[in-house]
Amino acid sequence: MLSDIEITHQTKLEHISKVAAKLGLNEDELELYGKFKAKISPRLEPSNSKLILVTATNPTPYGEGKTTMSIGLADALNSLNKKVCLALREPSLGPVFGIKGGAAGGGYSQLAPMEDLNLHFTGDFHAITSANNLISAMIDNSLYQENPLKIEKILWKRCMDMNDRALRFITVGQGGRTDGVPREDGFNITAASEIMAVLCLATSLSDLKERVANIMVAYDSDKKPIYVRDLGCEDAVCILLKDAIKPNLFQTLEHTPTLVHGGPFANIAHGCNSVIATKTALNLADYVITEAGFGSELGAEKFLDIKCRVAEIKPSAVVLVSTIRSLKYNGEANKDEITKPDMNALKKGIENLGGHIENLKGKFGQNVVVALNKFGFDTDEEINFVKEYCQKLGIEVAVCENFLKGGKGALELAELVLKACDKPSKINFTYEMSDDTKTKIEKVAKEIYGAGEVVFEEAALKKLEMIKELNLSHLPVCIAKTQYSFSDDAKLLGRAKGFTFSVKDLDIRTGAGFIVAVCGKIMLMPGLPKVPAAVNMKIDAEGKIDGLS
């Protein structure tokens, strides 16, 4: 089979103005970035369009194909003459050159041109990086200018959209008095910046400015918080973001319109594309497909409990993506023989799928359809077992082959999703906003993850008191934990239950408007692997790229 980039190069793409016309947009409404991408103005009016959330079972090192499935479903609906639009995240540049690769889908279900998307795209990440680092420069300048704010402990870090472990812990101001005040600092990857989360939850430019102003960046000598508004640069930060706040219009290989906008991490942030892009898509299309990062206990929970509240939206249907391979992995199959038939491992691992169905259907009250991403090594016996298991739970299953066949490989899924969208929809939230922070965390850990007990370590207990003092108990919670398990232990596979869930610390994100519960080591600046993907990339004399995936 051809590589992803070879498939892209063999596909004749439409001019972005032709793609825009499918959404009722004319060329005057586009800010063109070449032939195949454009920015559009936000449209935020209430809409009766159908929103479809794509989520997954717990991810494995192999990948479950969530973005590929989202694209395949959109192409299938497009082929059925439905007015459809995708609303997806922008990929981070760092992982493209590391081990993960890009985030444009795969096979014949891709966004294109994939090299445009995976590299600089329309410059949103660069604008976010500059905005983040302007705040850092303002902090260090305040220190240099005799520290009028009495800054004592700095929380804010610089950022860069690249995997570079050497920048995690650094010192700055080493050149003497004229070159700044010496201090310890560090870099996060841009996707981990609070500016990214703020941009993706903002509902307008004025809301963005208010959120930026409210970002807590330091504590003073009296242990009181210092905010961006105290630095006086919230307008300057938003000037850098005035174009980045506009959604980007793109297309799939089958020319389905796609809004690609924002890309916050799915652990320390909510892991969804921007509220503005999602609401704009809902104003332009009858069916909108979006996704949430990692498995449903992380990404979908944050989508439903955080994003849906902020945006005042709700899904009409939820697609739960899984693979036979991932279910066998969760059943502790031999990793060296994971592609071979193993009904014992599948029967054990399918409880992971059951746990996600229980949450989405039973807890959140969603209309769920399972999308089984089929591989060539899957057997009929294995596929039929998954179907029968889901049918007993009242869930329909579509076997999907869109990686190989494009939209026509997801037609069964499209039909099931259309049927699900015709049902009444609602959201049963995990917690009430009036609950205090501790109660909110306990409800997510016990009701969604399956924890038997929640333990707060000393640092977290101190932050709980601070949250009360700052009157921030009304904020939603965003739990940062491993994506590989329902629990906070990556090795606890399947459907873990009754475990002790440990909260190590709390990160107060006043700009984004949520409290991050830190439940394990969080990687905010990835490193490159032993053999980075960068070494396999080539570009010829005509500028044609190869080796990008």
Curated annotation (Swiss-Prot):
Record field: catalytic activity: (6S)-5,6,7,8-tetrahydrofolate + formate + ATP = (6R)-10-formyltetrahydrofolate + ADP + phosphate
CDD domains found in the cross-reference section: FTHFS
This enzyme's EC code(s): 6.3.4.3
GO molecular-function term, one example from the UniProt record: ATP binding
Keyword S-adenosyl-L-methionine: no
GO biological process entries: tetrahydrofolate interconversion
Known pathway: One-carbon metabolism; tetrahydrofolate interconversion
Domain of life: Bacteria
The protein, known as: Formate--tetrahydrofolate ligase
